[in-house]
């Protein structure tokens, strides 16, 4: 069964958000196929932009998918 890990970034700054995402990528089990990053869109785009810029070329990330009116970005992971 494929799993999804959700990470809610509300209330976090860019540094805290990156630390949380990096930790989730490091500890993701082989059955985890997506990290669902909930960054919101009503209070600016800094977190959304950081997620999309930092992780678009990450070696563990196959592609990014936008969800829910740009308030959520899924990191679709590569199989390792």
Model-found features: residue ranges?
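Long, charged, low-complexity intrinsically disordered regions
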Residues: 1-80
């Amino acid at each position: 069964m494929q799993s999804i890990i959700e990470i809610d970034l509300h209330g976090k700054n860019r540094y805290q958000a990156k630390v949380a995402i990096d930790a989730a990528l490091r500890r993701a089990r082989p059955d985890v196929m997506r990290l669902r990053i909930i960054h919101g869109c009503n209070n600016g785009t800094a977190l959304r932009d950081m997620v999309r810029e930092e992780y678009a070329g990450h070696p563990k990330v196959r592609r990014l998918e936008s969800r829910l009116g740009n308030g959520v970005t899924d990191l679709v992971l590569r199989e390792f």
